[in-house]
Amino acid sequence: MLPITQLEHLPKISGIYKVLDANGNVIYVGQAKNIYSRWNNGHHKLSEIIAEYGIEVYIDWAEIPEWLLNRAENATTSFYQPKLNSKTPPVV
């Protein structure tokens, strides 16, 4: 797990990531074929996350093969029901 201020240290792997607030609540879930690139090339939720939660936010991840990303993201999002995900997808 890394603070959102240390995006340059994210791994260059495919996987699911969770964004957690200062209290450890999952506020956003996503997937990427390259987690490092997703966040360091301007993630579409970054400004919203910082505006609402400040910089005391953390990113945690799990390495997942590319072929399993959609299913893993759907299951993770359904489990946590994070505030910043626009909709909670069904588990498939």
Predicted regions and their residues:
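Short, surface-exposed loop and linker segments with low hydrophobicity and enrichment for Pro/Ser/Thr
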Residues: L10-K12, L46-I55
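Basic, amphipathic alpha-helical patches used to engage nucleic acids or provide basic targeting signals
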Residues: W39-S47
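Basic nucleic-acid-binding interfaces
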Residues: I50-E66, N70
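GIY-YIG nuclease catalytic motif and its immediate N-terminal context
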Residues: M1-K33, S37, I64-A75
